[in-house]
Structure formats: structure tokens, C-alpha cells
Amino acid sequence: MSVLSPEIKCETSKFTRSSFGSCLIFESSWKKAVLETQKIKKEYTTAFGLEELKECIKMPYLPGLQSCQKSVSSTPLEVPKRLPRADAEVSAVRLKKTKETCSVAPLWEKSKGSGFSDPLTGAPSQYLERLSKIAILEYDTIRQETTTKSKKSKKRDLRDR
């Protein structure tokens, strides 16, 4: 983590907890959720002999993505209107700009060959509970932020009239 040098100082007297208003409503519950998740992660890391995640992580194979000979940025694909028959395994798609062909295999075919399984199928119930609690907190936070934004914009509209 980076450390602030002595030259960079912030006047803390200007900022108080109440001056932030509703921004910090979920702060304590988010902190609890993050700390509890980190604790569970550490337990499973030591219990199963897993390594800590490094900064450089290889991206896993994502099924359903196209494998092209040459990547072309922002080129639209010409997709056939009819799907090929079930016996045809791979359909060819031609890029309009470069006329290069890409092979597009159906999603279910590519997922069979990938070595990655769904990480949630074998996950412990505690881990799944933590994920669902975090998702609920995230949903509540986003919902609250959008409702306060819409209320503020309505108040501004009424004042402007």
C-alpha cells in the first residue's frame, strides 16, 4: 500500500461523519461483510492448502467467445439469419471489413472441453451465504443511491419551475 508523505496533509476538521450524510449508511455493514469474507477466505486457504492470489492471474477460458485468426477492433460481424443444422458443429462467420473467417462453436460444445467447472457448485454453504449477503447489500446500496438521486433531481425540477 502507498503511504502519504508528510507534505501531503488533509484538514480533517472540515470533514465529519455527519457531513457525508447518507453516503456512509452502509459503511459498517459493508466493513463487517468484507472482514467476515476475508476471514472465511483465510480459513479455506489454510485448510485446503491453497495459494494466495497473485496480482498477475491468467484469465480462464471463457466459453462462447470467438476465436479469430486476427483480432480487428470494433468490426461488426455478419451473422447468418438461420442457424445451421444440428449436425453441423461449427458455423463460419465472416468479418465485413477484412473478410477473415472466425470459427464460432456453440456455447455448450466449448464448455465441454474447458477444464474449468462452475466454482459455486462445490462451494461450502458458508461461502455461498456470504456471497448472497454481499449481493443483497450491493443491491440495497444501489437502490438507495438511485432513489436519492431521483428525489434530488425531482426537487431541482420543482425549484427550476
UniProtKB/Swiss-Prot annotation:
Lineage: superkingdom: Eukaryota
Organism of this sequence: Homo sapiens
Protein name per the record: Putative uncharacterized protein C8orf89
Pfam families (UniProt xref): DUF5537
